[in-house]
């Protein structure tokens, strides 16, 4: 199974970003903890990019303990960079559980 994933750093925070706009894969809390484990891939947060009909993307954030986070400014900036390069856009609009 092919999964498009990135490891990025934003002002000292590091993220694993998984693009699920074309293929939806649900991760369990245990899998999220494993991905974030510094002895495996390792990151402060896991970010999932989801397809959104009205906006450029929907974003889900997970802390390294597997808990849900509403949003993360540094992580959102990393995703915005990816999406702006992909779509050649200067502005990106994304949904999070905290806000648009």
Task: Give names to the regions the model predicted.
Residues 1-100:
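A glycine-rich beta-to-alpha transition motif near the start of alpha/beta enzyme domains, typified by
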